[in-house]
């Protein structure tokens, strides 16, 4: 989505380049055996693996969070989903606006005449990314002391529910 805003930076979107400066990327089709081998080779050199595919997608591909951790014990794996594992909604897909509504954020945004409204930025995605960033840093610090990686699980809904609870703390 963000890649297509414009083509002002050497054919790439300014927004995408701004948010991803210094990153390198490649495209792999994890359903192809050769690409899966390439992916596994990259995991062997990685410190962190973050995924936010549809619920169950990594398990169907054979790369669910437990699989990389068996082979690469120092790896920090971060799974981000719409809803927390083990909850009734765990298998549902989610997106920013839906979570804003379900967590109650849309009900406190807008005016008395407009009714509920979405926040002007993708606050759910951004906040969950920031929470993941903090958790990953903590896991990396822990790994420096223990030598062990970690498996982190974050959900869009839980992140927004926590933000919505701040006035009550």
Give the predicted meaning of each segment.
Residues 139-169:
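Substrate-binding/catalytic subdomain of NAD(P)-dependent oxidoreductase enzymes
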Residues 1-151:
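N-terminal helix-loop segment corresponding to the beta1-alpha1 unit
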């Amino acid at each position: 989505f963000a890649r297509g805003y414009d083509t002002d930076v050497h054919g790439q979107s300014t927004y995408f380049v701004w948010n991803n400066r210094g990153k390198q990327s490649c495209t792999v089709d994890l359903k192809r055996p050769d690409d899966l081998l390439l992916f596994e080779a990259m995991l062997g050199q990685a410190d962190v693996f973050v995924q936010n595919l549809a619920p169950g997608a990594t398990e169907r591909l054979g790369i669910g969070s437990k699989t990389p951790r068996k082979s690469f014990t120092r790896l920090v794996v971060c799974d981000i989903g719409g809803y927390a594992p083990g909850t009734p909604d765990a298998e549902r897909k989610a997106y920013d606006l839906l979570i804003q509504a379900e967590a109650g954020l849309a009900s406190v945004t807008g005016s008395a005449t407009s009714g509920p409204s979405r926040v002007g930025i993708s606050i759910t995605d951004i906040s969950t990314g920031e929470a993941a960033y903090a958790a990953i840093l903590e896991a990396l610090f822990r790994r420096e002391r223990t030598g062990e990686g970690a498996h982190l699980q974050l959900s869009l809904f839980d992140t927004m529910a926590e933000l919505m609870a701040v006035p009550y703390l």
